[in-house]
A protein has these predicted regions:
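An aromatic- and glycine-enriched ligand-binding surface/loop that stacks and positions planar moieties
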Residues: 1-28, 123, 127, 131-137, ...
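Long, intrinsically disordered, low-complexity segments
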Residues: 19-23, 40, 50-53, 125, ...
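Conserved, well-structured interaction surfaces
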Residues: 22-96, 111-112, 116-121, 130-142, ...
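Flexible, polar/acidic helix-loop-strand segments at domain edges
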Residues: 30-31, 35, 246-313
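Hydrophobic core segments within long, regular secondary-structure runs in both alpha-
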Residues: 51-54, 58-61, 78-79, 120-134, ...
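A glycine-rich, coil/turn loop motif that links secondary-structure elements
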Residues: 73-79, 141-152, 191, 350-353
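Active/binding-pocket-proximal capping segment
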Residues: 317-320, 327-346
Length: 418
């Protein structure tokens, strides 16, 4: 798994810019300013890695069908593969739009020169795979932490339905998830620390391990860290993101999510350091994906072991609030929204109109989920007016929404794409 989603979810959004040295990783800069062409290496790498995941999932789904083994274990393995296939297509459809929908093993005649499927068709397959995946176990032994669960299937299904504006169906999926009675909010400051990533709040996380051969580590620990810690200081938070934190906690202090998410000048950083604005192009760095040197020393900085939390319960609560509001029930959106706000130390919201509540929910998503690689996709699904206002003059909306170009390698080799 190559953890490149930040280059689209963060850098392409108004939450972050490329960062790093000016000449380093120039192709990420083209993602940042929407000038990426089909020969962009970032696009090619993401495409290749994601389709490799899909290929492996297809091999499992097809190959295990006639394998003599325990029926329950077989069902679980097929469901896990379908979940990972759905997760992969969910990323592809939201970055590229129409893509080849490959559902057979790589060596199958049906998998050669597969043309583009419609966005609607891809979402149909995503929903089918996730519906099949809800037979997954609700939990696993500690030694198998990181496997997809029933809650993960319901949660990703709800997200896919929300993205299609199927608000009622998304609420049903959320209700199914909540009926498992497994998830709750945890301490925000501790969510992104080693050992806490799979807390009661985590629904699906992609796990990594340090000190492994071959490597299975999280290199974000180096990509996003300051140079004084042997980091490359990419994914720099914008002033625009910092400026949304105007609302104080009920005790008058800053929203606790601000300093839990980023480093700011004069504030405590990792390793008993005080953050300096000189460490990045914007004056800020992402804190969420960094480990202290006591866990991963500077000499092996890229060998991080911190999990990437893709889906957590706070996201589900905000999705629930959004669905209720879009179904014209702003009053029913208050409870899930306030649970997230209260955890951050903020006061309750009540008595808002549908329009006011929509704005509040969108701002709350930006605060709560900052630098977890969701923002760009939220902007796209909220439409032209929201996206163009947030992304500024560098961004040009294209109907039905902006998609990044397919990689040239695929265009050259796949004769099914006309």
């Amino acid at each position: 798994y190559s953890i490149n989603l930040w280059k689209f979810g963060d850098v392409a959004s108004d939450d972050a810019v490329k960062g790093g040295n000016d000449g380093d990783q120039a192709e990420i800069g083209y993602i940042d300013d929407f000038t990426a062409q089909s020969d962009n290496g970032v696009i090619a790498e993401f495409w290749q890695n994601t389709y490799e995941t899909i290929s492996r999932a297809n091999n499992v789904i097809d190959g295990i069908k006639n394998t003599p083994m325990d029926a329950t274990k077989k069902e679980q393995m097929i469901a896990e593969a379908k979940f990972l296939r759905a997760y992969s297509y969910f990323q592809l459809v939201n970055i590229f739009g129409e893509v080849p929908l490959k559902l057979y093993p790589q060596n199958s005649d049906k998998n050669i020169y597969v043309g583009l499927s419609s966005v609607e068709g891809i979402y149909t397959q995503i929903e089918k795979d996730l519906t099949d995946a809800v037979v997954l176990p609700v939990s696993y032994a500690v030694t198998e932490t990181g496997r997809a669960t029933r809650g993960a299937a319901y949660g990703l299904l709800a997200k896919a339905q929300l993205y299609q504006k199927k608000y009622g169906e998304a609420l049903t999926s959320i209700q199914n998830l909540e009926s498992l009675n497994l998830y709750d909010l945890d301490s925000y400051e501790n969510l992104f620390k080693l050992g806490n990533e799979n807390s009661i709040e985590t629904i699906f996380a992609i796990c990594f391990l340090s000190n492994q051969v071959p490597t299975c580590s999280n290199a974000l620990n180096q990509w996003l860290a300051p140079s004084i810690e042997s980091g490359y200081f990419f994914d720099n938070p914008t002033q625009s993101w910092v400026d949304i934190f105007t609302e104080k906690q009920t005790d008058g202090s800053d929203d606790l999510r601000l300093d839990a998410s980023i480093g700011r000048d004069g504030k405590a950083w990792l390793n008993d350091n005080t953050f300096s604005s000189s460490w990045s192009s914007t004056g800020y760095l992402v804190k969420k994906h960094n480990q202290p040197l006591s866990e991963v020393d500077a000499g092996r900085k890229g060998d991080g072991g911190l999990a990437y939390i893709y889906l957590r319960y706070a996201d589900i609560l905000l999705m629930k609030a959004e669905c209720q509001n879009e179904l014209h029930h702003p009053d029913l959106a208050e409870a899930p929204l306030n649970r997230v706000r209260n955890r951050a130390g903020l006061a309750d919201i009540s008595g808002k109109t549908e329009s006011e509540m929509r704005s509040l929910i969108r701002t709350e998503r930006r605060k709560e989920l900052g630098f977890e690689f969701h923002r760009f996709f939220d902007l796209m699904r909220w439409g032209k007016e929201v996206a163009t206002e947030a992304l500024g003059p560098e961004f040009t909306w294209t109907e039905p929404r902006y998609y990044f170009p397919l990689p040239q390698t695929e265009l050259d080799s796949n004769l099914g794409i006309k």
